[in-house]
């Protein structure tokens, strides 16, 4: 479900302040954040933001194509290891 157009995009204030501070000083540091819900704005492009996936921070380099999406879209929270093959049934069939 998309957000109402009258509300506009959302970005956490602390994240926006950190990015603006780095842009003002022309620095490129990794920014740690737990805010997966924040929308990526054009002034984020070129920065690396470490987004929390529930157990660690995963670095994400922001490009032009990511503008308008949420930070959490680029960091999966679950790891799928596939279905475990049952060796007994495979031996019987062969």
From Swiss-Prot:
Presence of the UniProt keyword RNA-binding in the record: yes
Entries under PROSITE patterns matching the protein: RIBOSOMAL_S19
Classification via InterPro entries: Ribosomal_uS19, Ribosomal_uS19_bac-type, Ribosomal_uS19_CS, Ribosomal_uS19_SF
Keywords (A to Z) from UniProt: Ribonucleoprotein, Ribosomal protein, RNA-binding, rRNA-binding
Entry keyword annotation includes Isomerase: no
Taxonomic lineage from the root: Bacteria, Bacillati, Bacillota, Tissierellia, Tissierellales
Protein name per UniProt: Small ribosomal subunit protein uS19
GO molecular function, one term: rRNA binding
Functional note: Protein S19 forms a complex with S13 that binds strongly to the 16S ribosomal RNA.
A GO biological process held by the record: ribosomal small subunit assembly
Sequence similarity: Belongs to the universal ribosomal protein uS19 family.
């Amino acid at each position: 479900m998309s957000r109402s157009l009258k509300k506009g995009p959302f970005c956490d204030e602390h994240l926006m302040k950190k990015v603006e501070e780095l842009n003002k000083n022309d620095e490129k540091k990794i920014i740690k954040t737990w805010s997966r819900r924040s929308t990526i704005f054009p002034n984020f492009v070129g920065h690396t933001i470490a987004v929390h996936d529930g157990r660690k921070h995963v670095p994400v380099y922001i490009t032009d194509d990511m503008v308008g999406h949420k930070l959490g879209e680029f960091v999966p929270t679950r790891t799928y290891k596939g279905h475990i093959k049952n060796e007994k049934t495979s031996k019987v069939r062969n």
